[in-house]
């Protein structure tokens, strides 16, 4: 069996959709008319630096994802058995399943992005090396039950959402529990109770939209199960304030039998998440049943680095950065893809390596080994900065 999955916000990058806009000019013109600007110009050149703004990001990703699916059908015509998308990507899954047309889907996404961009006073953070159960426990112990779980991305990658001051207060509690806390650059508390007012506004356009029956089963974010008859409108409304149950989604699909996943659209974030979820999959849990709550397999809460970076601490590397091998690694860094970059860095540079960056004035020291954040970003945590740097932005101090 085959499942096509579509990524959501965070996967965007300048240059996405190259060749697709010219290959599908009719859809591109429709998108330009609905949006009021050139989606091709936004995606390929982004002259006004708007691509990372929510109201522009979401329509751009929707269009590129949709054109990617159309190209897939044009090239080989292989129909999937299931469809799923992460947050925004769910709109592409519904469009691919025939539930909604390209135009109506884009109109919904355009309005969704506009409304979400207006959200204020909210914050989000990714929690690594922490299970859902432990996350809820820590929030309760810290008297921070005002914070919601926004994304269950993998058994040990959770995203929390709430008022900015509450999210900031949560950081020391997670770090004390040896979890990694990564504040996210968002203006709103997406996928939390604080989006309820936004839901009311979004409901106006959703209820005016006609939805058809899917010709392929689509897995809903809010349940991690296939859509039932008549659920589309309410699920899309509720999605704004509900948790994205991505782990449950993949667990359910794995329980259907031998499953092949293919990510369509921008990047491979979901592909990497699926690899990690598979490692925690236990067929005996039978997540195909609505009564069963999937849970991580043995050892999946033990090491964020092992889970995210597919690497290990090299404890016998004593030299800091003076060897010829180290210098050669530095010279080759930009030639490696993110996974290889992480693996090579960890072979040569131990925790505590002194580094410099063009984006920071003083010398920094690594606090962790390198790892993949969100499946695509090679990064390392800095001790005296209390944040992450992309590995391509740092170099060993001389």
State the predicted function of each range.
Residues 61, 236-242, 334:
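Short, flexible loop segments at the rims of nucleotide/cofactor-binding pockets, characterized by
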Residues 64-69, 73-83, 240-314:
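Flexible, low-complexity segments
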Residues 125-127, 352-358:
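A short beta-strand micro-motif
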Residues 320-354:
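Mixed-charge, Lys/Arg-rich low-complexity intrinsically disordered regions
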Residues 356-395:
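Basic/aromatic-rich interaction segments and small domains that mediate binding to polyanionic partners
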């Amino acid at each position: 069996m085959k499942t096509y999955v579509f990524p959501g916000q965070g996967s965007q990058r300048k240059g996405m959709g190259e060749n697709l806009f010219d290959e599908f000019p009719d859809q591109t013109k429709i998108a330009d008319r609905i949006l009021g600007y050139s989606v091709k110009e936004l995606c390929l050149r982004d002259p006004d630096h708007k691509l990372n703004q929510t109201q522009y990001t979401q329509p751009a990703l929707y269009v590129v994802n949709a054109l990617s699916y159309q190209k897939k059908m044009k090239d080989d015509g292989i129909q999937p058995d299931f469809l799923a998308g992460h947050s925004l990507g769910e709109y592409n899954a519904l469009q691919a399943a025939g539930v909604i047309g390209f135009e109506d889907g884009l109109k919904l996404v355009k309005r969704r992005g506009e409304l979400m961009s207006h959200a204020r006073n909210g914050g989000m953070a990714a929690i690594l090396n922490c299970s859902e159960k432990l996350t809820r426990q820590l929030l309760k112990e810290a008297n921070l039950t005002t914070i919601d779980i926004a994304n269950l991305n993998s058994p040990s990658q959770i995203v929390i959402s709430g008022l900015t001051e509450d999210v900031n207060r949560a950081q020391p509690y997670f770090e004390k529990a040896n979890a990694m806390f990564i504040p996210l650059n968002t203006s709103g508390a997406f996928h939390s109770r604080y989006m309820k007012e936004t839901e009311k506004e979004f409901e106006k356009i959703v209820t005016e939209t006609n939805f058809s029956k899917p010709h392929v089963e689509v897995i809903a974010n809010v349940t991690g199960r296939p859509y039932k008859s008549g659920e589309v409108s309410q699920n899309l409304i509720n999605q704004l304030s509900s948790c994205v149950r991505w782990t449950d989604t993949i667990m359910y699909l794995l329980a259907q039998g031998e499953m092949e996943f293919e990510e369509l659209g921008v990047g491979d974030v979901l592909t990497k998440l699926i690899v990690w979820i598979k490692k925690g999959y236990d067929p005996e849990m039978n997540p195909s049943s609505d009564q069963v709550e999937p849970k991580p397999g043995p050892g999946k809460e033990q090491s964020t680095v092992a889970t995210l970076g597919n690497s290990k601490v090299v404890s016998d590397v004593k030299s800091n950065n003076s060897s010829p091998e180290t210098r050669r690694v530095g010279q080759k860094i930009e030639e490696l893809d993110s996974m290889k970059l992480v693996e090579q860095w960890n072979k040569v540079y131990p925790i505590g390596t002194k580094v410099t960056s063009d984006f920071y004035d003083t010398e920094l020291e690594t606090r962790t080994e390198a790892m993949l954040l969100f499946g695509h970003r090679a990064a390392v945590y800095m001790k005296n900065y209390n944040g992450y740097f992309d590995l391509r932005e740092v170099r060993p101090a001389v």
